């Protein structure tokens, strides 16, 4: 309901939470579609757009696309230092992915 009626920053936030809950339900493809909508149409609300990239990284990992997952998260860390909380969240996700992958792949360094 909120997502349908909201505009501006509230719409961006509503889309973020829609993507978040779809990710939590392991509906990674649908979650990425919501993230893409947010980025395409509400990128002026940078906080929510950047925060949604972390969800996208988690979605890619859920879809077993480690390369895309790490690429997205590394770019958040590298390019959006003005959002400390989001960078911290992206770093936590990236570290978790690298740790999991290091257990099954010797070419991946956990740090």
Label each PLM-derived region with a short phrase:
Residues 1-111:
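Acidic, polar-rich low-complexity tracts and alpha-helical solenoid repeat scaffolds
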């Amino acid at each position: 309901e909120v997502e349908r009626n909201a505009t501006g920053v509230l719409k961006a936030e509503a889309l973020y939470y829609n993507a978040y809950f779809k990710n939590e339900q392991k509906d990674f493809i649908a979650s990425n579609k919501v993230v893409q909508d947010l980025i395409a149409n509400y990128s002026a609300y940078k906080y929510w757009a950047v925060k949604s990239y972390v969800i996208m990284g988690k979605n890619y990992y859920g879809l077993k696309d480690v390369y895309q997952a790490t690429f997205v998260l590394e770019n958040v860390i590298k390019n959006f230092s003005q959002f400390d909380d989001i960078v911290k969240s992206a770093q936590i996700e990236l570290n978790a992915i690298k740790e999991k992958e290091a257990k099954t792949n010797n070419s991946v360094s956990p740090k």
